[in-house]
Each structure stands twice: as C-alpha cells, then as structure tokens.
C-alpha cells in the first residue's frame, strides 16, 4: 500500500492528555518574568501589550525544557533594561488551549510568535534560542526596521558572517525605491536584518562604485552576495526569499540553520537528503557532489540537504533510518520514499538521475518495525511490513487501532481494546489489532490526525473509521453491524450461484424429448 509522505519535519502534536491549567489572574501576571497564559487570560493580556512574545510549549518536550531557563533569563534581562518587550508562555499541549494552538498554527514545539499592537500583527520568531541572543534579536525587532550604515567598520561588524543580511544603497533616503525597501524591511524583519547606506564603498563585497538604488543581499553560502535593482514590493520579497535560501540546506547543530530547515521541510517539493559524518575524509567530495546535483537538477522540483549524522538523531528516528547505512541518500517524493545506503560521493548524481528518469523501477522505502516472530496475543501487532497480510488480504473483519506510546488516551484505551479482543477471540473471522503510528509508515488508505485513531476493515473490503464511544460494548456492536461474511462464505455463495446459473442454462437450452412408442 502507498504510504503517507511527511514533508514537514516538525512533528504535529496530536491529542492532549495534560491536566487543565489554572488561569492566571491579571493582577498577578507581573510577579514572574515570563507570563503564564491560557485560554482564560490570553486575549486580555496580549491586547494590553504593544510587543509580546509568546512561547507555545509542551511539558514533555525536550527542546522546550532546554529553552525554558534561557527564555526566563531573557525575560529578566529585558525587564531590567526596561524595554517594552514582554515574554509569555502557553502550554499548547493542554486541551483547554487547543483553540489557541490551532489559531496560531502550532505544529511543533516550541513555537514562538511575536505579537505586536495588541495582537493585531503576528509574526514568527526567527532568532536564537539562548538568552543573550534572544535579547539582542528582540532589541532589533523593537527598533527601526532598517539601520543606517555610515562606516566600513559598522558594515563589517553588521554584515560579515552574520547570516542573510540586506543592505539598500540609495543616493538619497527618499523616493519609491527607498520607501518600498522600508516597507519590506518592516514586513520581513523577523527573519532578516536590514540596513541602508548612501555609500557602497563601505560594503565588504560587491561593486563599491554603485550609487544605487540597489539592494545587496549578503549570505554566508553559495555566491556570498547578490544584487537586485527591482524595487517592486512583491519582486523584492521574492528576491529575498529565493536568493536568501541555500541551494543545499545544512542539517547540523548551528542554530542559524533552523529557519532554513523549517522552510525546507515545509515546502511541497521532493526532498533529497544526504546524511554523512562531517568527520568523514570524503566530506568535501560529498559536499561538492550534492551541490553539483542541486545545480544539475534545479528544474526538477527537488530541494537538497546535507546533514551531519552526529546531529541527526531526530531525523533518523522519525524516518526510521539506521546509522549503519551512512553515508546515505534519502529521497521523499509524491511517489514514495527511496533510500540509497552506504554510498560513495560519485554515486550521488547517477542515482538521482535514475530516480528522476526511472523512479518506477526503484523499490520504495517503507519505515517499519520488525514483523513480530510471535503474534499470539488477543490484540495482534501490526507493522508496516505485515499490514497487507493481517488487514487487507486476510479476508477477515479487522478492527485496527493506530496509537502512540506517549499518548495518555491510548494507554487508557489499551485496556478496552484488550477486553474487546478477549471477548471476540473465539470468532475466527474477527481480528483486533494495533499499530504504533510513530514508528511505522501509515498507508494512505487511513487518515490519522490524532491518537488513538480506530478503523474497521470488513471481510468484504469496506473501510470505515470509528468515531463512536470508546467502550467495549459500543465497539463490539459496531463490529457486528459492519462485519462482512465469514471467510470463505462469499466464495461459496459465488460458487453456488455460478453452479445454479449453469444448471439453469443447461435446462433452458435442452430440447424437449419426444416419447415415441
């Protein structure tokens, strides 16, 4: 069966089982450096602050736990400096706050949003995750959208090796070009730093004799700088988004790459991911070949990434990859997922060419737990590699639960599922089964947006989702109402129908026998 293709690496948080949080009284909100918000006080608090930063987190999230002390420290520094910036947090895993989670598009943890003008202007946070970096980033967000550069020293300090930087060069700070530059700077300031100058000679790269107006984009990758003279607002935004994105994204521990990774995994293009040890003697050859592949296949709607296996634990766990297969090239596309393990640098381009031209001849990769050697419990264990045998091709009526080990509702339902399985274990035409959706690819026949998700596949081939009460009585009733004929019964009926039809045809076509004596 085809599998769901996950093009966003940010894992969706599915069903909350946390206890309800206690609301924060508005008079008590200023006693802590980081304000605690929930559905009860969120709108009131956000509305009265011109600049508030909100962290959406989950109590169990490791990255949230790492960020928490840095976020608290940053809040304390900002308060002591009397900057008009407030830091707050929301437990987005709490069911009470689900509406806030959905409203602000929280699909991974932590997610940080900058809310200005009482919440009317909401933007993503694109800055560092340590206290000093958070403070400096937010200071820039409070100040002017673009800063004026007046010396080579200022330019060197602001531009060199500072990520993606935009500098507008203008003969005078007026006119349509300058105004549009400032509008775009205000709109995109959360993700990029903007500067302007009237003297291109102070800039560290590019033609220093230009008078402008031009926009020069500096970046620490690819061609290092790019110029544009198109000051239409839409054109300027597109120039920044395209030129400011690496030809090959790097997956490593560098926090400046986080925003590139988020965009990489959220775009609908196919993904080609090369994972290798950055300590490998051949690393420069691998980098050269993946960049050459990105140039060669730029028109094939493929986004490219190179990752250090030392920092890729989450990726490997999520996609079910093995470190023993490194160096590996992994492709995710609408047609499936494809893996080329233990490869050499000079195999990258030929294999990608084969994928593009002959992908139908490549065996798709499916993430699956091992098939259980023993599967004799009342609740059968289904994995990606045996779902066809147990569910689709068994000829039986199968109730299948998709669950996650961390899901509290799933743990409660496990007892009920066991009760159902024991009650029906003498019925040879019914199978009660479960599948861990976090470590197995789920066929596209199923829509799993939360855990637990329950489906029923009848012996006659009907697939139904179960949305009723999670009680043994209700589910058993649902199974009996929707079950198909017993295994072999349909075939027997078919065979008898065919025999009857043949007999009828023979009888009707035989000429009457005349008795002559």
Curated annotation (Swiss-Prot):
Acts as a protein-folding catalyst that interacts with nascent polypeptides to catalyze the formation, isomerization, and reduction or oxidation of disulfide bonds. May play a role in storage protein biogenesis. Residues 1-23 form the signal peptide. Residues 24-143, 357-484 form the Thioredoxin domain. It is an enzyme of class 5 (isomerase). It is found in: Endoplasmic reticulum lumen. It comes from Oryza sativa subsp. japonica (Rice). One of its GO terms (molecular function) is protein disulfide isomerase activity. Its main location: endoplasmic reticulum. The record marks 62-63, 408-409 as: Contributes to redox potential value. It catalyses: Catalyzes the rearrangement of -S-S- bonds in proteins. A motif (Prevents secretion from ER) lies at residues 514-517. InterPro entries: PDI_thioredoxin-like_dom (IPR005788), Prot_disulphide_isomerase (IPR005792), Thioredoxin-like_sf (IPR036249), Thioredoxin_CS (IPR017937), Thioredoxin_domain (IPR013766). Disulfide bonds join 61-64, 407-410. Keywords: Disulfide bond, Endoplasmic reticulum, Glycoprotein, Isomerase, Redox-active center, Repeat, Signal. This is Protein disulfide isomerase-like 1-2. Glycans are attached at residues 41, 301. One of its GO terms (biological process) is protein folding. Belongs to the protein disulfide isomerase family. Its EC number is 5.3.4.1. SUPFAM superfamilies: Thioredoxin-like. Pfam families: Thioredoxin, Thioredoxin_6. It comes from the Eukaryota. NCBIfam families: ER_PDI_fam (TIGR01130), pdi_dom (TIGR01126). The active site is at residues 61, 64, 407, 410.
């Amino acid at each position: 069966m085809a599998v769901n293709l996950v093009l966003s690496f940010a894992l969706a948080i599915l069903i909350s089982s946390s206890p309800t949080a206690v609301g924060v009284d508005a008079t008590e909100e200023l006693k802590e450096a980081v304000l605690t918000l929930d559905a009860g006080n969120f709108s009131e608090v956000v509305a009265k602050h011109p600049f508030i930063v909100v962290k959406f987190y989950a109590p169990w999230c490791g990255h949230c736990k790492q960020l928490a002390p840095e976020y608290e420290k940053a809040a304390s520094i900002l308060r002591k400096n009397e900057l008009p910036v407030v830091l707050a947090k929301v437990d987005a895993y709490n069911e009470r706050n689900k509406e806030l989670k959905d409203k602000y598009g929280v699909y991974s943890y932590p997610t940080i949003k900058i809310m200005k003008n009482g919440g009317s202007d909401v933007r993503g946070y694109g800055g560092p995750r340590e206290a000093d970096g958070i403070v400096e980033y937010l200071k820039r967000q409070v100040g002017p959208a673009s800063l004026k550069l007046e010396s080579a020293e200022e330019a060197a300090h602001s531009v060199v090796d500072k990520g993606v930087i935009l500098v507008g060069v203008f003969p005078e700070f007026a006119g349509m070009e300058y105004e549009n530059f400032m509008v775009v700077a205000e709109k995109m300031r959360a993700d990029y730093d903007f500067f302007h100058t009237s003297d291109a000679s102070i800039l560290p790269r590019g033609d220093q004799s230009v008078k402008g107006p031009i926009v020069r984009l500096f970046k620490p990758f690819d061609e290092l700088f790019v110029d544009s003279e198109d000051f239409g607002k839409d054109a300027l935004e597109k120039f920044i988004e395209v030129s400011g994105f690496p030809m090959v994204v790097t997956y490593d521990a560098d926090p400046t790459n986080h925003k590139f990774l988020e965009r990489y995994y959220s775009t609908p293009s196919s993904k080609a991911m090369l994972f290798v040890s950055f300590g490998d003697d051949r690393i420069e050859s691998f980098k050269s070949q993946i960049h050459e592949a990105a140039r060669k296949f730029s028109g094939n709607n493929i986004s490219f990434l190179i990752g250090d296996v030392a920092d890729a634990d989450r990726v490997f766990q999520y996609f079910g990859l093995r470190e023993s297969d490194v160096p590996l090239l992994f492709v995710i596309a609408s047609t499936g997922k494809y893996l080329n393990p233990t490869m050499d640098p000079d195999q990258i381009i030929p294999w990608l060419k084969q994928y593009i031209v002959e992908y139908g001849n490549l065996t798709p990769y499916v993430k699956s737990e091992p098939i259980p050697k023993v599967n004799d419990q009342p609740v059968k264990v289904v994995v990606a590699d045996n779902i066809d045998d147990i569910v689709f091709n068994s000829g039986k009526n199968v109730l299948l639960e998709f669950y996650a080990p961390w899901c509290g509702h799933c743990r409660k339902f496990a007892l009920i599922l066991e009760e159902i399985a024991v009650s029906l274990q003498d019925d040879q035409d019914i199978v009660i089964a479960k599948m861990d959706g976090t470590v197995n690819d789920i066929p596209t026949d199923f829509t799993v947006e939360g855990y637990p998700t329950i489906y029923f596949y009848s012996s006659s081939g009907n697939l139904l989702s179960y949305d009723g009460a999670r009680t043994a009585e209700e589910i058993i009733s649902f199974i009996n109402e929707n079950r198909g004929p017993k295994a072999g019964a349909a075939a027997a009926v078919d065979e008898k129908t065919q025999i009857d039809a043949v007999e009828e045809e023979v009888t009707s076509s035989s000429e009457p026998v005349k008795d002559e004596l």
